[in-house]
Amino acid sequence: MSSNAKWLNKVKWDEHGLVPVIAQEVGTNDVLMFAWMNRDALAKTIETGEAIYWSRSRKKLWHKGEESGHTQKVHEVRLDCDEDVVLLKVEQVGKIACHTGRHSCFFQKFEGGAKDGDWETVEPVLKNPETIYK
């Protein structure tokens, strides 16, 4: 697939050639994670049917689950009204999306008020990350 496809040109890429991506679990609608894609990542995601992101720290394509086996099977791809955010509806293989071993990267919830509040961990570790990433 050409990374110059018309549908790729519709996406409003940022100054670094990236677009923010939200991965949402199909069925439960749980928000699993936030990541980035470049044109190649989005094209390969469509080609393979599995989520492939752009790692800003490693500066390379990142096939979600390439090390852990916790891949994301893509059921649906949506573009928001401003055409600058992508939503992936995915099946999370192994039920673990976060590198901390949790189901979702959004496992901290703000509790309390503006003066006395703090972030509380509200989701358990499903698998020790040391055993996931050897």
UniProtKB/Swiss-Prot annotation:
Cell location: Cytoplasm
Catalytic activity of the protein: 1-(5-phospho-beta-D-ribosyl)-5'-AMP + H2O = 1-(5-phospho-beta-D-ribosyl)-5-[(5-phospho-beta-D-ribosylamino)methylideneamino]imidazole-4-carboxamide
UniProtKB keywords: Amino-acid biosynthesis, Cytoplasm, Histidine biosynthesis, Hydrolase, Magnesium, Metal-binding, Zinc
Subunit structure and binding partners: Homodimer.
Any single Gene Ontology cellular-component annotation: cytoplasm
The protein, known as: Phosphoribosyl-AMP cyclohydrolase
Annotated positions binding Mg(2+): D80, D82, D84
MF term (GO), any: phosphoribosyl-AMP cyclohydrolase activity
Binding residues for Zn(2+): C81, C98, C105
Pathway info: Amino-acid biosynthesis; L-histidine biosynthesis; L-histidine from 5-phospho-alpha-D-ribose 1-diphosphate: step 3/9
Matching Gene3D superfamilies: Phosphoribosyl-AMP cyclohydrolase (3.10.20.810)
Predominant subcellular localization, coarse grouping: cytoplasm
Native source species: Janthinobacterium sp. (strain Marseille) (Minibacterium massiliensis)
Requisite cofactors: Mg(2+); Zn(2+)
